[in-house]
Amino acid sequence: MKKSLDHLPPRKQAELRQVVETVRAAFEEAVFSRRADRLKNGKILKIILYGSYARGDWVHDPVGRYFSDYDLLIIVDHEDLTDYEFWREAENRTMPVGPDIRTPVSLIVHALDDVNDQLDRGRYFFADIVREGGVVAAALVRLSRAVDKERGREPSQRQ
């Protein structure tokens, strides 16, 4: 997984930072008034950019009216936090209608346990994200034993 998004132009980097801040703020508002600790104390563990912007082959074609979107995998600490009710406002706020965010944004949300399970099962979609994606925001959390095996480490050697 890439640790830098330096291949993106400065304007795209700034826009992506704004997207991340917007997503985080909307999520914090969505969990703020919850009573259950697992929801009230819910956390975004990682936000990973994948797809064309992560690979560096995005399209910006005003003539053909085609524009690549930011594909973001959001990893949360509890399965219940993947429910759409927590992300509706984040999606609304990241629509490309204002001067701060002009690129379409596509969010998918999975719990860490689910992502690790998908990686352990060798699901291509998740394996591609780990291989090609770039971490936009992260807490100190590791993904799957499958990633460790790919890198020649035993799970007990995780940092």
Positions of predicted regions on the chain:
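Catalytic core of pol beta-like nucleotidyltransferases
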Residues: 1-48, 52-68, 76-159
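Conserved RNP beta-strands of RNA recognition motif
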Residues: 72
